[in-house]
C-alpha cells in the first residue's frame, strides 16, 4: 500500500529515530520525501510503501507516547 505521511515534531535525534522505527515496523520503503526545518521543528512529508499502512489509532498512540510530536497525518 502506498501511503502519504506527514509529521511535524521537535527536531531531535530521538524523535527522528522513533519516527523512522515506526515506518520500518511497517516495512517502509520511501518513494519520495520532503524535509524542512523551522523554529526548532522538523517537518517530514513522505510517500512510502507500507504493509500494513499506519492507522489513525497508531498515529494517535505515537503522538501520545511522544509529546514532541506536534502534528501527524496518515
Located regions from the model:
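A short beta-turn/loop motif at secondary-structure boundaries
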Residues: 36-40
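Short amphipathic alpha-helices in soluble, non-transmembrane regions
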Residues: 18-24, 55-68
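Conserved short beta-strand edge segments in small beta-sheet-based binding/regulatory domains
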Residues: 29-35, 60, 64-74
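Canonical alpha-helical transmembrane segment with a positive-inside/aromatic-interface signature
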Residues: 1-35
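Helix N-cap motif at beta-to-alpha junctions
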Residues: 12, 49-55
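Short, hydrophobic beta-strand segments
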Residues: 3-5, 42-48
Amino acid at each position: 500500500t502506498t501511503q502519504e505521511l506527514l509529521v511535524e515534531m521537535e527536531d531531535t535525534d530521538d524523535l527522528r529515530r522513533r519516527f523512522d522505527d515506526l515506518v520500518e515496523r511497517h516495512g517502509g520503503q520511501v518513494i519520495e520525501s520532503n524535509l524542512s526545518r523551522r523554529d526548532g521543528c522538523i517537518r517530514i512529508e513522505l510517500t512510502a510503501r507500507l504493509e500494513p499502512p499506519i492507522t489513525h489509532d497508531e498515529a494517535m498512540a505515537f503522538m501520545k507516547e511522544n509529546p514532541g510530536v506536534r502534528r501527524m497525518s496518515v
